[in-house]
Amino acid sequence: MGEAAAVVAVNGERYEAVGVDPSMTLLEFLRTRTPFRGPKLGCGEGGCGACAVVVSKYDAAADEVTSFSASSCLTLLGSLHHCAVTTSEGIGNSRDGFHPVQRRLAGFHASQCGFCTPGMCVSIFSALANADRAASAAPPPPPTPPGFSRLTAADAERAVSGNLCRCTGYRPILDACKSFAADVDLEDLGLNSFWKKGERADITKLPAYSCTADVATFPEFLKSEIRSSGGAPAVAVTGDGCWFHPRSIEEFHRLFECNLFDEMSVKIVASNTGSGVYKDQDLHDKYINISQIPELSAINRSSNGIEIGAAVSISKAIEILRSDGGDAVVFRKIAYHLGKVASPFVRNTATIGGNIIMAQRMSFPSDIATVLLAAGSTVTIQQVASKRMCLTLEEFLKQPPCDSRTLLISISIPDWCSYDGITFETFRAAPRPFGNAVSYVNSAFLARSSLDAASGSHLIEDVRLAFGAFGSEHAIRASKVEEFLKGKLVSASVILEAVRLLKGVVSPAEGTTHPEYRVSLAVSYLFRFLSSLANGLDDKPENANNVPNGSCTTNGTTNGSAESTVDSFDLPIKSRQEMVFSDEYKPVGKPIKKVGAELQASGEAVYVDDIPAPKDCLYGAFIYSTHPHAHIKGVNFRSSLASQKVITVITAKDIPTGGENVGSCFPMLGDEALFADPVAEFAGQNIGVVIAETQKYAYMAARQAVIEYNTENLQPPILTVEDAVQHNSYFQVPPFLQPKPIGDFNQAMSEADHKIIDGEVKLGSQYYFYMETQTALAFPDEDNCITVYCSAQMPEVTQDIVARCLGVPFHNVRIITRRVGGGFGGKAMKATHVATACAVAAFKLRRPVRMYLDRKTDMIMAGGRHPMKAKYSVGFKSDGKITALHLDLKINAGISPEFSPAIPYAIVGALKKYSWGALAFDIKVCKTNVSSKSAMRAPGDAQGSFIAEAIVEHVASTLSVATNTIRRKNLHDLESLKVFFGDSAAGEASTSSYSLVIIFDRLASTPEYQRRAAMVEQFNGSSRWKKRGISCVPITYSVTLRPSPGKVSILNDGSIAVEVGGVEIGQGLWTKVKQMTAFALGQLCDDGGEGLLDNVRVIQADTLSMIQGGWTAGSTTSETSCEAVRKSCAALVERLKPIKEKAGTLPWKSFIAQASMASVKLTEHAYWTPDPTFTSYMNYGAATSEVEVDVLTGATTILRSDLVYDCGQSLNPAVDLGQVEGAFVQGVGFFTNEEYATNADGLVIHDGTWTYKIPTVDTIPKQFNVELINTARHHSRVLSSKASGEPPLLLASSVHCAMREAIRAARREFAAVGGGTGGSDQVTSFQMDVPATMPAVKELCGLDVVERYLESFSATTA
């Protein structure tokens, strides 16, 4: 057997992987052994798409190249010998020219923080290439119009279905995708920089695309090597281990017969995508790549069915089932269902066999196993030194878990075309309809039946019922139910009995989340299937086309999460944007594209972890406590290959003499320790930092850590607000942060006609899910100095903490932040821990140290949004006017105060959007043994605004009036606004500036709204199993202006460098600052400054260059940074005016050259502070959302959302629009799907993309309309602008409120059949907490609605 290293081509360049770790992934190789940093580590699970690349393989025999997208974080380098890889830089770049995909992403304003954009670019590019390739392989299709691809608009939406973005809300990304689709109406595309609003959309104005331009070409040199080498070597030596590439099953078996391997040291791989689910706990030194065995990739078609080799990818299997399946409905529906498994770039490499092996060996909740089980599939396996066996899939799944010596060879799916009366359906319930989410339950049913002419129902002759993912070891057949149904004529009573039997079969194992919900789902799916075989079972046919709504129509199921393969849920995304542009301050006010957007799309934009590792760099990973309250007695490591890579562990004892054990500090509110010492006070607290030679070794060694705990003499942990109340465990709120009550509550309550006492609502936490996890790189320097590059929203505070921890003066510490890959508050105080830990390690070891947290550690340590429990008592008149409100609120702050004492003020501020008459509250900030909660986008305001809506809806249901009536009745007038908001409302001198009432009436008090509400009611009257709701929610949001520095320097060539205290985190700060600089210096230019835009560069934040930088938080940093820059420019203009007057008309460059020759100072620094009489102002908006809820599954589709937001005189409407849409969709996640779960010790267990589900392209509104209105000018605001970053998040509660209306309709429907929802009051008034996940919605609709309906139907027809 020969020996060789893997050879790959990356963007056309040859690389030989010599001396690399055999477990090295392609992503690690790209980022450490090549100059290409476009692929990012977002999750390490194949769940986000940030690492996507295009892989190309060459078949020398056929002289054919195949290309596909893949997750480089899962793909092992050793499996890519003689492959070509194309990254986002290879698609296009600043030197060779940007690709149309990159330019369109930039032009459609589809990149904000930019961390996800290279992966988006690769996914779109791959989809375009695949569509063009498929079209060329088929019979000659009609030519596409010039500039378009073969991609359809529907396929374009799916192209990025596996890619996550936390910033944009996806709408502009989808527009960029669909701009390539031949069937798109260009007029439907949103705001872009290619044609102005109102101009005719024209394909010729888009960056030209040609499907003949194949970027991902396969290098000729690699083809030559492949032809001459004959393929991959049998053995490849890589660093500390070996890769084996057997060419036959016999060769595979011989490897084991020679006793070279044991179960622990060897890993068998075909694609390695399983490591995204089941992480390697240790390193392996031997890998066997079975993908080179031809028999495992074979596909055989016969009259009996299709035999698919175990190493065939899921994508290839889908293609075969669609094309070779002919008229076989079973094959087509299996293919459709498989398209919901994982994401495109995972399906392209993940194998059918690997998925089934994981289901058999590791109890993986496989969709594929369930679907193939119902289809009657068989498998062929072979063990070492044994004969081949053909087993039914059911037999195989029931066997003891396979070992590494058992090889799954193929899967055979029978062809059912020769049978008459076959009905086959598959179902799955998951938070995302396009896939990329594990099912709560999946099921597949196949029945052979005949129609009974007399009854019109079907007689079941044979049936197969398969269920999976409900909490069992593997997919199962419901044999008892099958036996019962055989020979039965399908009727309500038969289905009812089948359902009762099923509930005894589908039994989730102990510890399974939402067990009752999963059983209910199984019942719902069996009901759906069997009711299609019964005649006259439902007198309300599910046909939404009969009842159109204001946004879209649909056929069958429209929910985005639980679908039958024959249902149409994927309505196209449509949108509309309305805004007013102004030329008064041009280029300020223009919707110019984001600075550096093309660089972000190409992957050339540099984030902290993209900085090349310096010589002798070490890497760190946190070891954290899994116990909520315990003494740390010691840290040891399991004996393993990973633990051998440990260099040292940095703990509290390594803090320099004179330094403090401090990891974060919020000014005036308190510190949090960097290291647990000597007691860990919460699960997830940092105990130490493992230092190793590579980041991967550090990660794996940290997993091998064994912590010795001792709980003697310690009180039990306080984990909940209830525990905190019992132990009187609270943080004090400083007087200056305490909200003030309004009016006399007791007096106002006595005037009420009606009272609600002790209403309750709970809100969970939310994780930031910035795409770039916490990261830092520390360089030790001379004289006890240190430089730290970190991803931080507060570089100045980070400098403070690092200096305190090291015990050095502040001027010894330099913090540099160029750009941040998403923040949302999570890169404020939480970023300081990583930066400080890096600094301590680098200071101690005198070597550079880098840390980039893996997603799980980041999620466990991050803290997130504050969970809370609210109780309220409210009094109101019979006409709906509220007279008094008392709020009793318990906030879970975690172990340290951090930002938490400021949360009550924010909650009450948002609550005050309504005039409550008298307002009183008792708010406790609870100290608990969980990770400290921190500021997250709209901290406190998001919760307060929602609590207000919950109260108003409770009042409305009590009075049996429309909720909008109560909302409108209790909106402020100018007088009450000033009573409730005081100084924040000082600028609202007239109704034109207090725009909330106008906005609300524009949405909710119009004939159009009444028409839509009537259509919703009509739909609900004609649809039993789907219900719609519509709701309009107003918001107010007070923001605070803070001092901000700015520095403008004009260089001798006329280029301009600008520094500001704010950090670019995706909010468009650099773009607005660039526009403001051009405007403010425009007085010196003949064209008014627009020509200066290309001369301006905003440079990175540097705490030794720009002091008093402050915080990038609170939504006002962009405008205050702009004002500081305007002030600097004003001084420069005054200084340069005499030169300009003498010089007359001159080009900018010549003019500046003259000024320089005249020794004019060409730099100016300003520190802007707000007017003491105007330090805050109000923001207003409203949103109407319409949703559809599937009563059987709890799945929700947002049919339409209309947002109107008062942006003042927008500094950049495109940027502000992106902020509004992104905030709204992030809010949708908080209010609906993002379930933040912990174990009994408070340790976060929803700690990755597999368990924590942020919104994706398939969960945003199907019709997404946004209008930015420009209200009256105000001289105290920056060019009359307003904030846009945080306030729009509150509008997402309109989705939750609409869901409540739909659920209320369902409860009314099924109250008539008895049981389940209690009395009439409970039907309309019910507690609906946050988030309203699928299980929560289904429970509120009724877990037993199927049984109740069947019982009622059977009784009425008996």
Curated annotation (Swiss-Prot):
It holds the Pfam family Fer2_2. Its EC number is 1.2.3.1. One of its GO terms (biological process) is abscisic acid biosynthetic process. Residues 549-561 have a biased composition (Low complexity). Keywords: 2Fe-2S, Abscisic acid biosynthesis, Auxin biosynthesis, FAD, Flavoprotein, Iron, Iron-sulfur, Metal-binding, Molybdenum, NAD, Oxidoreductase. Residues 236-418 form the FAD-binding PCMH-type domain. Binds 2 [2Fe-2S] clusters. One of its GO terms (molecular function) is FAD binding. Residues 540-567 are annotated as: Disordered. Its cofactor is [2Fe-2S] cluster; FAD; Mo-molybdopterin. Aldehyde oxidases (AO) are homodimers and heterodimers of AO subunits. This is Probable aldehyde oxidase 1. It comes from Oryza sativa subsp. japonica.
